[in-house]
Amino acid sequence: DRTCYPVASCNLQDFHNLVDVYLDAVFHPRCVDNEKTFQQEGWHYELDSADQEMTYKGVVYNEMKGVYSSPDSVLAREAQQALFPDNTYGVDSGGDPTVIPKLSFEEFKDFHGKFYHPSNSRMWFYGDDDVEERLKILDSFLCEFDKKEIDSTIGTQKYFTEPKRVVASYVAGEGEEADKSFVQ
């Protein structure tokens, strides 16, 4: 339901530079303007040699493969999906590596354009630096956007009428016995 970008520095010039970098990265990311960047960061096909199978690669894709290989993460995700099957809390924000390759560049751009807009944001500053300077920095980014009505309402999960049992599987670690690997 949110993405947080905390920025801090004891050096005021560094802080202002970081705010510029973060605002630019959030509201003007290269991956929504350049399909090659989307492919590098998200996912793409890769062929190391002609005699091997084509594989999926990408920064996010590889990170999520790592997340999905941890028994703790697998079981926590299964619990979240079982508890919240009807709203966003049951969905993994990083993406399921088996589904990530189905995301098109256009779908990604549309999602970013809808939800990563200043009209759908909250910004806080804390500190004893000049408030006017902060507002000038924000204005330099926000002035180019028009206000949009964005429905980012998250529906309430319906109550369960009976107990729910979830059985999930995951890959046991190397050297572990599958039947004794993990219980939670």
What is each of the regions a protein language model found here?
Residues 1-183:
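Charge-rich, well-structured scaffold segments of protease-associated domains
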